[in-house]
Each structure stands twice: as C-alpha cells, then as structure tokens.
Amino acid sequence: MVSEVTLDKSRQMYEKAKTLIPGGVSSPVRAIKPYPFYTASADGSKIRDLDGNEYIDYCLAYGPAVLGHNHPVIKAAIKEQLDKGWLYGTPTELEVTLAEKVAGYYPSIDMLRFVSTGTEATMSALRLARGFTRKNKFIKIEGGFHGAHDAVLVKAGSGATTLGEPDSLGIPADFTKYTLQAPYNDIETMTTLVEKNRDDLAAVIIEPVLGNIGPILPLPGYLKELRKLTKENDVLLIFDEVITGFRLAMGGAQEYFGVVPDMTTLGKIVGGGLPIGVFGGRREIMEMIAPSGAVYQAGTFSGSPCSVAAGIAVLDYLKKEDIHAKLNSTGDYMRAVVSEIVEDEGLDYTVCGIASMFKIFFGAEPHNYQEALKCDKEGYLSFFHRMLANGVFLPPSQFETNFISAAHSEEDIEKTLEAYVENL
C-alpha cells in the first residue's frame, strides 16, 4: 500500500493558479485539500497528472465520460465537424438530428431546446414552467442540486454541502422567496406543501436520484406518488436528469423507474463530454419559448455544432453496443463486493448506488439530505487520499457520486477493489 503520491508539479501549478483563479480552480468541487492534482491527459479509464501519476478514474468529469476519456468514436465526430467549422450562429441539421434522437428516448419530451450547461437548462425550465402556468412558486428537494443560479441555491447539494455553504452570499432574499423546499422521500411533507401552495405553485423540480448528495435513491413508490400528487394539483413535474439522463438507461430515470414527468432537463452525457444542456417537455409547454412564445431564452453557443456532433456519436454508440447492460452489471458487482468488504471489516459504512453509480457512505444509509449530513466527511476525505495514493481517483467529496464507464476493464475493477480492501 502506497501512503502518498508525489504531486510536486501540481502543487507548484496550484500556487500559481491561486494568484490568477480564485481558489486555484474553475469550479469549487475541484478544490481538493490541501491542493488538487492538475491533469495533463486522459485516455480510456485512466487520467494522468502533471507529475506523471496515473489513476483509474471513477470521477469521469463528474459523469459525462460514460464511454471513458478520449473515445475514438466521439473524437472522430468532433474532428469531422471541426473541419467544417465549429460555430456558425445559425441552425444546423445536426441539432435537428440530435433533438429527434433525444425525443425518441424520452416520452416526456415532444420538443426541446439546446443550451450550453445544465445550469442553463434548469434555469430556463423553471422560467418556462412559471410562464406556462402563470404561477410563481416552485418546490425543490433539500440537497437537490440544479446548478448555480440564484433561485435554486438553497440547501443545494454538490460543492455547497461539502464546503458547508448550503446558500451563497450575493443572493437577495427576494430571489428565493418563491423557492419552497421539501425533504427527499417524504411524500407527506410534499403533499402538505403542494396542497397549501397549489394556487401559485408552478412546478416541483427533482433529481429522481439525488446525485450530488449521495447518490440517494428514491424509496419504492415515491416518484410515482409524486407524479400522482402533481397531476392532481395541476402542478408541473420537472425531472432534472442532468446526471441520470443516458446514465441509468437510454431513457434515464424515467425509463428506469417508469415515471413520466411534464418536463426534463439533461446535460453531461448528452454532449459526449462537450458543453451542452437540454430542456424539453410537452409540446404545449415548449411552444411558449421564444420565438414561438413569450418566455425568453437565448444563447450564443446553444446547439454548438461540435457538442451536438459529439452527442449524436455517443448516443448512437450507447444504443448500438448495448453499453448500459455492461455498465449496470459492473455497478451491481462493485456494490456487492465493496459491501462485503465493509461487512468483513466490521465498519459502520454503507454502500449506496444504482446502475453505474456507486458510493461508500461513511455512516448509515441516507434517505434524505439531513441524514446525509450526519456522515463522517473528514473520514471520507482521508480515505480519498489513500485511494489516490494507490492509483484510484474517486470524487473528493463524500457527496459526489462515483461513475463507471465502458472503458473500465476487469483489471481496473479488480485493482480498485484491492485498493478498497487495503484502504478502508
């Protein structure tokens, strides 16, 4: 067992970066303590830092790299588009092709709009829900992460939880006065909130699986009861599938659990690793978006040709090669073996996950945000560093999900499991 890894070049780069970039990183989840490693390259299941260290990667850019890094099929699609130009400011045939493919997999989507990020997707979806319903309020789940726009940064997951900053300075109270919250997996509290506010309640937005505070899974029947509740009260249901979309199945969580929302947001995988976001829904809702309707949304890079080309390539490959069968089988295997390791060691830890998402929780299995907060964050961080020293890169936060890619080999999996045995 290796006790530490040499990161001299990364440390030097971090010292320089801190003088130019706040915190030395471009997103707070990358701010590994005492300093992050800086990536030089990545290929397949491996990622390499400036010091030449190589790691088996289960972070996978926080989800998008479902085929692994630098996949030849995606790279070929991007190169082909680069030869034709990479930004036009006009519609393209490619975006129509990708829109048709996405709508074919998601029964909740009759029409959709491309944006550049998941944050834009959820921000636009909520604006549209309010515009369509002529109502102001919405409900989000405690610990649900829907990007970094003002209305949703209330008890959000992801880096905000890790840093102990569930809210953010710079957001006037008036911006969130229409943001209501309910605990995950608590249909009784949700029912009370919905029924009390239904006259001015536009939508409920939810990650079907809480991916930035776990993963935490829905209890049996929870999503179906939520769907029934929102329908009965004339409230839109929005599934934020930025993480679960094309991850659990081609049709995401709504296919996996058999629940169809009114609107869906997507990101990460659907762009093949390039910047993209999608929001879509029923035709009568989506036709409210400009220029068809009076709800405004626009973006210079929306429908970016390279992102769309990469998206077409990854979706076609996932379907043709039946990738989800392998991914989900590997996920089942890893969760089972790590659970055995935890039991054999007599540890009070829990292995959580679904499909190709998994995580070891340093505490009891959580079913909501408040239960997740009881975990041993410092204990997990120490474990993260031990795994990194032994060539396994897990997300540095207790609250970020591990992902499996199609590039992870049997050898990768067995080496990883050996590292779990040695470092738990």
Curated annotation (Swiss-Prot):
Going by the UniProt record, its keywords in alphabetical order are: Cytoplasm, Isomerase, Porphyrin biosynthesis, Pyridoxal phosphate
The biological pathway it contributes to is: Porphyrin-containing compound metabolism; protoporphyrin-IX biosynthesis; 5-aminolevulinate from L-glutamyl-tRNA(Glu): step 2/2
Q: Which coenzymes or cofactors are required?
A: pyridoxal 5'-phosphate
Can you name one GO molecular function term for this protein?
Answer: transaminase activity
Share an example GO biological-process annotation for this protein. protoporphyrinogen IX biosynthetic process
This entry carries the following GO cellular component terms, namely:
cytoplasm
What EC identifiers does the entry list?
A: 5.4.3.8
What highest taxon heads this organism's lineage? Archaea
PROSITE patterns given for it?
Answer: AA_TRANSFER_CLASS_3
Which InterPro entries does the entry link to?
4pyrrol_synth_GluAld_NH2Trfase, Aminotrans_3, Aminotrans_3_PPA_site, PyrdxlP-dep_Trfase, PyrdxlP-dep_Trfase_major, PyrdxlP-dep_Trfase_small
Q: Does the keyword DNA-binding apply?
A: no
Task: Name the major location.
Answer: cytoplasm
Family, according to the entry, reads as follows:
Belongs to the class-III pyridoxal-phosphate-dependent aminotransferase family. HemL subfamily.
Name of this protein: Glutamate-1-semialdehyde 2,1-aminomutase
Organism, scientific name = Methanosarcina acetivorans (strain ATCC 35395 / DSM 2834 / JCM 12185 / C2A)
